[in-house]
Amino acid sequence: YNTPNTESLIRLREKVLSAPPLLEKKQRILHIGRLVKWKRVDLLIDAYAKICPNYPDSELTIIGNGPEMENLQYQAENLGLTGRVVFVGAIYDPFTLGQYMHESSIYVLAGMGGLSINEAMCYSLPVICSVCDGTEKDLIQDGVNGYYFESGNADSLAKSIEYLLRNPQMMKAFGDVSLKKIQEEINLDTVSSR
């Protein structure tokens, strides 16, 4: 699971941090991944619909392509979320992906897996996910740098997102822990490879 070379991610992060912002400033909830059923992006959209009215400055940004794209766009439209759920399509450029992560507030994985947890943590993001295959356990500590929600439960997911949106200081504290964990992991790697 120790996916993208963490050191090169940190180097990339330094470039991203010094670049001018790409996006309008918002409380951005981010998901990156192929739009396939088992990623449960539909669940994320449902959860966002529940809290969206209370956070006019928030946006759900979905990066990725896949067979579920049309269904998900239709779902967002039906829920009255046009303009609040933004489908970006696939982005393959690591720098641009980094900019999106840097300019987001929370990273959410609603379904199965994604190597993107490491990357999101590099950009000091709190992570919300369900326990899927256990690899998350090494990275995300519930109530420390993210939350686990009850798998398949939109209310539980909405509650976790809302809790962070409502507590910006905590969101920042969680994000700081994420980055620290990644930096420590790098140091461990460096130590163990000597």
Predicted features along the sequence, with ranges:
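Acidic anion/phosphate-binding donor-loop and adjacent secondary structure
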Residues: Y1-K26
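Conserved donor-binding/catalytic core segment of Leloir-type glycosyltransferases
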Residues: P21-K39, L43-K50, T61
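Nucleotide-activated donor-binding/catalytic signature segment of Leloir-type glycosyltransferases, i.e.
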Residues: E70-I91
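A short, well-ordered alpha-helix in the C-terminal region of glycosyltransferases
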Residues: R84, S156, Y163, M170-E185, ...
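Short alpha-helical donor nucleotide-sugar binding micro-motif in glycosyltransferases
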Residues: A90, L97-S104, A120-M121
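Acidic donor-binding loop of glycosyltransferase active sites
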Residues: Q99-M112, L125-P126
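Short acidic/histidine- and often glycine-rich active-site loop of Leloir-type glycosyltransferases
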Residues: N118-C122, C132-G143, Y147-Y148
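Conserved acidic donor-binding segment of nucleotide-sugar-dependent glycosyltransferases
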Residues: D142-G143, Y147-A154, Y163-Q169
